Design a protein with these regions (language model features):
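Active-site/ligand-binding-proximal alpha/beta "capping" segment
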Residues: 188-238
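Short acidic-hydrophobic, aromatic-tinged amphipathic segments that line or gate anion-handling sites
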Residues: 1-4, 73-78, 164-174
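Short beta->alpha connector loops at strand-helix junctions that form conserved
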Residues: 77-78, 116, 142-143, 165, ...
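Structured adenosyl-cofactor binding patch, chiefly the S-adenosyl-L-methionine
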Residues: 96, 133-134, 148-161, 220-260
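Boundary-proximal intrinsically disordered activation/regulatory segments immediately upstream
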Residues: 1-61, 145-146
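A glycine-rich helix N-cap at a beta->alpha junction
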Residues: 65-87
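RNA substrate-binding interface of SAM-dependent RNA methyltransferases
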Residues: 99-194
Length: 260
Protein backbone atom coordinates (compact mmCIF):
# COMPACT_ATOMS: atom_id res chain seq x y z
CA UNK A 1 0.00 0.00 0.00
CA UNK A 2 1.16 3.54 -0.78
CA UNK A 3 1.06 5.52 2.45
CA UNK A 4 3.01 8.69 1.61
CA UNK A 5 2.13 11.66 -0.57
CA UNK A 6 5.85 11.80 -1.43
CA UNK A 7 5.72 8.44 -3.16
CA UNK A 8 7.09 8.87 -6.73
CA UNK A 9 3.92 7.43 -8.27
CA UNK A 10 1.72 9.83 -6.31
CA UNK A 11 3.98 12.73 -7.29
CA UNK A 12 3.69 11.71 -10.94
CA UNK A 13 -0.12 11.64 -10.71
CA UNK A 14 -0.12 15.05 -9.02
CA UNK A 15 1.94 16.52 -11.86
CA UNK A 16 -0.36 15.05 -14.50
CA UNK A 17 -3.38 16.51 -12.73
CA UNK A 18 -1.81 19.94 -12.39
CA UNK A 19 0.12 20.64 -15.57
CA UNK A 20 -0.71 20.43 -19.24
CA UNK A 21 3.01 20.31 -20.04
CA UNK A 22 3.44 17.10 -18.03
CA UNK A 23 0.41 15.51 -19.68
CA UNK A 24 1.90 16.22 -23.10
CA UNK A 25 5.41 15.07 -22.18
CA UNK A 26 4.15 11.82 -20.68
CA UNK A 27 1.40 11.26 -23.28
CA UNK A 28 -1.02 10.47 -20.47
CA UNK A 29 -3.65 12.01 -18.22
CA UNK A 30 -5.62 11.10 -15.11
CA UNK A 31 -9.32 10.34 -14.74
CA UNK A 32 -11.04 10.31 -11.37
CA UNK A 33 -14.07 8.35 -10.24
CA UNK A 34 -15.76 5.16 -11.27
CA UNK A 35 -17.97 6.61 -13.99
CA UNK A 36 -15.19 8.39 -15.89
CA UNK A 37 -12.92 5.36 -15.55
CA UNK A 38 -15.69 3.16 -16.96
CA UNK A 39 -16.26 5.61 -19.82
CA UNK A 40 -12.56 5.67 -20.70
CA UNK A 41 -12.00 1.93 -20.49
CA UNK A 42 -15.29 1.14 -22.21
CA UNK A 43 -14.28 3.35 -25.13
CA UNK A 44 -11.00 1.53 -25.64
CA UNK A 45 -8.60 3.83 -23.81
CA UNK A 46 -5.80 1.95 -22.10
CA UNK A 47 -5.02 2.34 -18.38
CA UNK A 48 -1.35 2.57 -17.47
CA UNK A 49 -1.93 2.45 -13.71
CA UNK A 50 -4.93 2.37 -11.39
CA UNK A 51 -4.98 3.75 -7.84
CA UNK A 52 -7.70 3.06 -5.29
CA UNK A 53 -8.40 3.37 -1.58
CA UNK A 54 -10.50 1.36 0.86
CA UNK A 55 -13.27 3.96 0.40
CA UNK A 56 -13.97 2.68 -3.10
CA UNK A 57 -17.51 1.58 -4.00
CA UNK A 58 -18.43 -1.99 -4.89
CA UNK A 59 -18.68 -0.95 -8.54
CA UNK A 60 -15.24 0.58 -8.35
CA UNK A 61 -13.79 -2.51 -6.68
CA UNK A 62 -15.14 -4.65 -9.52
CA UNK A 63 -13.38 -2.35 -12.00
CA UNK A 64 -10.13 -2.61 -10.05
CA UNK A 65 -10.32 -6.40 -9.93
CA UNK A 66 -10.97 -6.56 -13.68
CA UNK A 67 -7.89 -4.42 -14.39
CA UNK A 68 -5.78 -6.60 -12.09
CA UNK A 69 -6.84 -9.66 -14.09
CA UNK A 70 -5.75 -7.86 -17.26
CA UNK A 71 -2.29 -7.24 -15.86
CA UNK A 72 -2.65 -3.51 -15.26
CA UNK A 73 -0.50 -2.10 -12.44
CA UNK A 74 -2.95 -1.52 -9.57
CA UNK A 75 -1.96 0.21 -6.31
CA UNK A 76 -3.91 0.58 -3.10
CA UNK A 77 -3.39 4.02 -1.55
CA UNK A 78 -4.04 5.35 1.92
CA UNK A 79 -7.41 7.19 1.74
CA UNK A 80 -5.97 10.50 2.97
CA UNK A 81 -3.18 10.37 0.38
CA UNK A 82 -5.57 9.62 -2.49
CA UNK A 83 -7.96 12.32 -1.27
CA UNK A 84 -5.11 14.86 -1.35
CA UNK A 85 -4.95 14.44 -5.13
CA UNK A 86 -8.61 15.29 -5.65
CA UNK A 87 -10.03 18.79 -6.00
CA UNK A 88 -13.56 17.54 -5.33
CA UNK A 89 -15.18 17.69 -1.90
CA UNK A 90 -15.39 13.92 -1.55
CA UNK A 91 -12.76 11.69 -3.13
CA UNK A 92 -14.35 8.78 -5.03
CA UNK A 93 -11.43 6.56 -4.05
CA UNK A 94 -10.38 5.73 -7.61
CA UNK A 95 -7.92 7.25 -10.09
CA UNK A 96 -6.60 5.87 -13.35
CA UNK A 97 -3.63 7.04 -15.39
CA UNK A 98 -4.70 6.73 -19.03
CA UNK A 99 -2.47 6.60 -22.11
CA UNK A 100 -3.16 9.44 -24.51
CA UNK A 101 -4.46 8.49 -27.94
CA UNK A 102 -5.75 10.31 -31.00
CA UNK A 103 -9.10 9.14 -32.30
CA UNK A 104 -9.15 9.05 -36.11
CA UNK A 105 -11.00 11.71 -38.05
CA UNK A 106 -13.77 10.54 -40.39
CA UNK A 107 -12.67 10.46 -44.05
CA UNK A 108 -15.30 13.10 -44.87
CA UNK A 109 -16.08 15.84 -42.37
CA UNK A 110 -19.55 17.35 -42.38
CA UNK A 111 -20.08 18.77 -38.87
CA UNK A 112 -17.16 20.14 -36.85
CA UNK A 113 -16.88 22.22 -33.69
CA UNK A 114 -14.08 24.75 -33.27
CA UNK A 115 -13.40 25.90 -29.70
CA UNK A 116 -11.69 29.27 -30.03
CA UNK A 117 -9.94 30.76 -26.98
CA UNK A 118 -12.26 28.93 -24.58
CA UNK A 119 -10.44 29.27 -21.26
CA UNK A 120 -13.09 28.09 -18.80
CA UNK A 121 -12.71 24.34 -18.11
CA UNK A 122 -16.35 23.83 -17.17
CA UNK A 123 -17.56 25.53 -20.33
CA UNK A 124 -15.27 23.54 -22.61
CA UNK A 125 -16.22 20.23 -21.02
CA UNK A 126 -19.93 20.99 -21.25
CA UNK A 127 -19.56 22.09 -24.87
CA UNK A 128 -17.73 18.89 -25.78
CA UNK A 129 -20.47 16.87 -24.09
CA UNK A 130 -23.14 18.73 -26.10
CA UNK A 131 -21.10 18.34 -29.29
CA UNK A 132 -20.85 14.58 -28.85
CA UNK A 133 -24.61 14.39 -28.23
CA UNK A 134 -25.34 16.51 -31.32
CA UNK A 135 -23.34 14.24 -33.61
CA UNK A 136 -20.34 16.48 -34.15
CA UNK A 137 -17.66 14.44 -35.93
CA UNK A 138 -14.61 16.23 -34.53
CA UNK A 139 -13.67 19.14 -32.30
CA UNK A 140 -10.75 21.41 -33.15
CA UNK A 141 -9.18 23.26 -30.23
CA UNK A 142 -7.80 26.58 -31.42
CA UNK A 143 -5.04 28.55 -29.64
CA UNK A 144 -5.97 29.89 -26.23
CA UNK A 145 -8.31 27.00 -25.44
CA UNK A 146 -7.89 25.10 -22.18
CA UNK A 147 -6.58 21.51 -22.28
CA UNK A 148 -9.44 19.10 -22.97
CA UNK A 149 -7.82 16.50 -20.69
CA UNK A 150 -7.45 18.64 -17.59
CA UNK A 151 -9.39 17.28 -14.58
CA UNK A 152 -12.17 19.89 -14.63
CA UNK A 153 -12.74 19.59 -18.39
CA UNK A 154 -12.86 15.81 -18.11
CA UNK A 155 -15.45 15.97 -15.34
CA UNK A 156 -17.64 18.44 -17.23
CA UNK A 157 -17.27 16.45 -20.46
CA UNK A 158 -18.68 13.31 -18.83
CA UNK A 159 -16.68 11.07 -21.15
CA UNK A 160 -17.13 13.05 -24.39
CA UNK A 161 -13.36 13.23 -24.83
CA UNK A 162 -13.22 9.44 -25.12
CA UNK A 163 -15.65 9.31 -28.06
CA UNK A 164 -15.13 12.59 -29.94
CA UNK A 165 -11.99 13.04 -32.08
CA UNK A 166 -10.07 16.08 -30.80
CA UNK A 167 -7.26 18.03 -32.41
CA UNK A 168 -5.28 20.94 -30.99
CA UNK A 169 -4.56 23.06 -34.06
CA UNK A 170 -3.41 26.49 -35.19
CA UNK A 171 -5.86 28.64 -37.09
CA UNK A 172 -3.78 28.09 -40.22
CA UNK A 173 -4.29 24.34 -39.85
CA UNK A 174 -8.01 24.72 -39.12
CA UNK A 175 -8.57 26.83 -42.22
CA UNK A 176 -6.56 24.39 -44.35
CA UNK A 177 -8.77 21.49 -43.23
CA UNK A 178 -12.00 23.43 -43.65
CA UNK A 179 -11.13 24.74 -47.09
CA UNK A 180 -10.08 21.51 -48.77
CA UNK A 181 -11.44 21.74 -52.34
CA UNK A 182 -12.91 18.23 -52.31
CA UNK A 183 -15.25 18.91 -49.38
CA UNK A 184 -15.04 22.43 -47.96
CA UNK A 185 -16.65 23.32 -44.65
CA UNK A 186 -18.37 26.68 -44.21
CA UNK A 187 -17.07 28.41 -41.07
CA UNK A 188 -19.92 29.81 -38.99
CA UNK A 189 -18.94 32.01 -36.06
CA UNK A 190 -21.27 32.65 -33.14
CA UNK A 191 -21.04 36.33 -32.22
CA UNK A 192 -23.29 38.05 -29.69
CA UNK A 193 -25.42 40.77 -31.28
CA UNK A 194 -23.96 40.33 -34.75
CA UNK A 195 -24.74 38.23 -37.80
CA UNK A 196 -27.93 36.60 -38.96
CA UNK A 197 -30.27 34.86 -36.52
CA UNK A 198 -29.15 31.24 -36.43
CA UNK A 199 -32.43 29.83 -37.78
CA UNK A 200 -32.10 32.00 -40.91
CA UNK A 201 -28.74 30.48 -41.82
CA UNK A 202 -28.50 27.30 -43.89
CA UNK A 203 -26.94 24.88 -41.42
CA UNK A 204 -27.65 21.81 -43.53
CA UNK A 205 -24.46 22.34 -45.50
CA UNK A 206 -21.10 20.93 -44.40
CA UNK A 207 -19.88 23.28 -41.69
CA UNK A 208 -17.57 24.09 -38.83
CA UNK A 209 -19.19 25.94 -35.94
CA UNK A 210 -16.82 28.31 -34.13
CA UNK A 211 -17.56 29.09 -30.48
CA UNK A 212 -15.46 31.73 -28.74
CA UNK A 213 -14.73 32.42 -25.10
CA UNK A 214 -17.36 33.94 -22.87
CA UNK A 215 -15.46 37.05 -21.79
CA UNK A 216 -13.80 38.20 -25.01
CA UNK A 217 -15.52 36.13 -27.68
CA UNK A 218 -13.67 34.66 -30.63
CA UNK A 219 -10.08 35.53 -31.45
CA UNK A 220 -9.09 37.89 -34.26
CA UNK A 221 -7.97 34.85 -36.27
CA UNK A 222 -11.32 33.17 -35.74
CA UNK A 223 -13.21 36.26 -36.89
CA UNK A 224 -10.99 36.59 -39.95
CA UNK A 225 -11.57 32.96 -40.93
CA UNK A 226 -15.36 33.05 -40.55
CA UNK A 227 -17.53 32.84 -43.64
CA UNK A 228 -20.67 33.95 -41.81
CA UNK A 229 -21.60 35.31 -38.39
CA UNK A 230 -24.49 33.83 -36.44
CA UNK A 231 -26.41 35.35 -33.57
CA UNK A 232 -28.90 34.07 -31.02
CA UNK A 233 -31.71 36.64 -30.72
CA UNK A 234 -32.29 37.62 -27.08
CA UNK A 235 -35.44 39.70 -26.58
CA UNK A 236 -34.78 39.89 -22.86
CA UNK A 237 -32.45 42.23 -21.02
CA UNK A 238 -29.37 40.01 -20.78
CA UNK A 239 -26.47 41.07 -23.00
CA UNK A 240 -24.97 37.63 -23.48
CA UNK A 241 -25.29 33.94 -22.77
CA UNK A 242 -22.93 31.57 -21.05
CA UNK A 243 -20.64 30.10 -23.74
CA UNK A 244 -21.76 26.53 -23.06
CA UNK A 245 -25.44 27.49 -23.20
CA UNK A 246 -24.93 29.38 -26.46
CA UNK A 247 -23.00 26.47 -27.96
CA UNK A 248 -25.77 24.04 -27.02
CA UNK A 249 -28.39 26.20 -28.73
CA UNK A 250 -26.28 26.51 -31.87
CA UNK A 251 -25.35 22.83 -32.04
CA UNK A 252 -28.91 21.65 -31.73
CA UNK A 253 -30.18 24.19 -34.25
CA UNK A 254 -27.90 22.38 -36.70
CA UNK A 255 -29.50 19.10 -35.59
CA UNK A 256 -33.01 20.55 -35.91
CA UNK A 257 -32.42 21.80 -39.44
CA UNK A 258 -30.89 18.54 -40.57
CA UNK A 259 -33.68 16.41 -39.14
CA UNK A 260 -36.58 18.48 -40.49
Amino acid sequence: MITSSHNPKIQAVRQLLARRKDRRQNASFVVEGVRLCEEALGSGWQPMEVFYSENISARGRALVEEQQKRGVDVEEVLPSVLASLSDTETSPGLLAMIAERELPLPPELDFVLVADALRDPGNLGTILRSAAAAGVQAAFLAPGTVDAFSPKVLRAGMGAQFRLPLRTLSWEQIVAICKQPARPLALFLAEAGQGVPLWQADLRQSLALVVGGEAEGASAEGRAAADQLLSIPMPGQSESLNAAVAAGILLFEVVRQRLT
